[in-house]
């Protein structure tokens, strides 16, 4: 009876994950593990659920536990690969996905993970080959379609990206990744309001969705020149990391001081004053920009009505 109950809890967790109820799935899996604490498949699935909940440290513990319990289990290595990707350990992730494919060469999810790894490492050709192989093994998989669409859009193939998004949405109308991809296509075409509607559609399903918030922010940035400039500057600085962004700011400040000094030495005091004012304006703008953007976004999110089953 206990084993049957565990299997029911596992199946229920799968259904919960499929509809986006990540916390519910975590609770179901913890109940199952309280009865079968050494079941590697449950640990692997719990790791995937914890990763979806952005609890990567807990996910790593569960994934490593699954591999330790069953080194021959492909899904344990596959899940460990995704967890390592969350830590930006691309070499470790490649090793885990490689081991998963050694054990199960026809596992579409492992091929998809390998494709995402190549994409993260900026190897688009290798990423496309791996994801297309995953799609060959599991035709119509919306995640693979969206990943291929992302590669198409990044390469400037807008129509191909649109076709991928529409194919995924045809079978899965509420698929978050497909909605975000379609929104990105619309943004690239300058159809900002329609892109915003796709972002709202995502947020109705999950108000914490990073994809939905990312798309909504991008749409807001397109609708306001000042907010758009701040958004692009912030995105650029965030991509550098803390250390490099500090170096950039220090470099800009030093360059500004040198320029002002040079202008004064050349007798161009008016130009030096303008340069000083421009720096002050830049400093104030980057200081108040986050608050203005957050307030604008909060007004947008206030209009979102969540689904009843969220």
Predicted features and spans:
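Alpha-helical segment of the N-proximal tetratricopeptide repeat
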Residues: 2-41, 45-52, 82, 86
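Helix-start (N-cap) detector for alpha-helical repeat units in TPR-like alpha-solenoids
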Residues: 6, 40-41, 74-75, 108-109, ...
């Amino acid at each position: 009876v206990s084993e049957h109950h565990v299997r029911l809890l596992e199946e229920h967790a799968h259904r919960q994950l499929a509809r986006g109820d990540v916390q519910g799935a975590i609770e179901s899996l913890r109940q199952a593990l309280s009865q079968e604490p050494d079941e590697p498949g449950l640990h692997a699935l719990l790791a995937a659920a914890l990763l979806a909940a952005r609890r990567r440290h807990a996910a790593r513990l569960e994934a490593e536990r699954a591999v330790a319990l069953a080194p021959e289990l492909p899904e344990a290595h596959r899940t460990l690969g995704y967890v390592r990707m969350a830590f930006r350990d691309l070499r470790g992730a490649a090793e885990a996905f490689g081991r998963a494919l050694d054990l199960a060469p026809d596992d579409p999810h492992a091929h998809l993970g390998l494709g995402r790894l190549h994409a993260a490492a900026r190897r688009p050709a290798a990423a496309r080959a791996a994801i297309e192989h995953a799609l060959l093994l599991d035709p119509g998989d919306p995640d693979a379609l969206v990943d291929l669409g992302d590669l198409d859009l990044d390469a400037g193939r807008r129509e191909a990206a649109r076709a991928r998004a529409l194919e995924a949405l045809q079978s899965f109308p509420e698929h978050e990744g497909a909605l975000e991809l379609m929104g990105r296509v619309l943004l690239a075409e300058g159809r900002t309001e329609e892109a915003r509607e796709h972002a709202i559609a995502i947020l109705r399903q999950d108000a914490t969705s990073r994809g939905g918030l990312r798309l909504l922010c991008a749409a807001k940035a397109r609708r306001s020149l000042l907010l758009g400039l701040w958004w692009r500057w912030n995105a650029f600085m965030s991509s550098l990391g803390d250390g490099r962004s500090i170096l950039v700011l220090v470099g800009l400040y030093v360059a500004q001081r040198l320029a002002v000094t040079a202008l004064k030495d050349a007798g161009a005091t008016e130009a030096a004053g303008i340069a000083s004012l421009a720096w002050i304006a830049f400093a104030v703008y980057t200081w108040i920009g986050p608050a203005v953007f957050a307030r604008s976004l909060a007004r947008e999110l206030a209009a979102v009505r969540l689904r009843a089953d969220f």
